[in-house]
Amino acid sequence: MIEPQPSSLVSEYVRTYGRFESRPQLVNPLEAFAGMEQRLRQLRLKEWIGFTLIHPELYSSLVIQDAHYLASSEIYTFDRRRGELYEHASNARGGSPTLPPELFGSECVYTRPGYELVYAFGAERGTHRISLDIAASRRAPAMHGELSLDGGGGPPPLSVSSRLPGGPMYTHKRLYPARGSIRVGDSEFVFDPARDLAILDEHRSFLPYQTRWLWGTFAHIGLDGPVGANFISRAGGAADPEESCIWTRHAAEPLDDVSFAPQSAGPLSPWRMWSADGRLDVVFEPDGRKDVRHQLLLAAIDYFQLFGRYTGTLRSAERTHTLRGVHGVCECMLARL
């Protein structure tokens, strides 16, 4: 069941749960707590806002994230024609990025010397912008660009507040037609809103100390407009609706009980993903992989994101959609945070 949009995720210390028609105007999970409990909960709160870019010649994802004891930003690009993967990453003091609880009408900013990433959100159905200005490093060329996103051009959003075994989760996801360009070294990638998309992923969640998930997303613009899916499998499951859905032009249809199965142990093995009801049944063929591994005293991350092509079927309420080589990503997170 889709609930009406609440004005705030938390009101008078009471949090609202469910699937919403659209994002609450104010999303601050810490408002459910006060005093010392709020300060302690802040250390468990993980917030990020990122985009997966869909373009025929480019795979790319970018993110601003704040774990409150540490903040960071990352971007990678993979030039399909040249077969070149480039990555930039930056760390900062926890709390230093600007990730306002009122997303629309606000700016999300991460800036460090030689690294600037800005998301400027207009009205919910207005125009949003991604701007990046990143200097060259020893391992990657400079990256510059600006994309304009059509807030009214995609399907309805996925907006979910759920109870998870380790703590509550909130996410807001949406498909946006994208216009503009990104330059990577001497290569320029021009985005056409009739063909190309940016998939928004906003998360504000109290993740458990030991965290594991498998997640995937993909989208393309078909004859009926944008079509795609977002799907996840977590250790321990969830008592409330999860963040899985099928996107069509008119709906973000709930999707539950999704399974992930690699076809081998190889780092670029194909994966099969399917839902128990058969509405999602796809095979993902990776074209490349980004790995992140960190080992600290009390914290560790073992993460990879595969980028590649999805083939299979999506069965929405309207019809069955056949997918052939649709671009997207699949990731695995194993962490102590």
Where are these regions (language model features)?
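Structured soluble/peripheral alpha/beta segments that form catalytic or ligand/cofactor-binding pockets
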Residues: 1-337
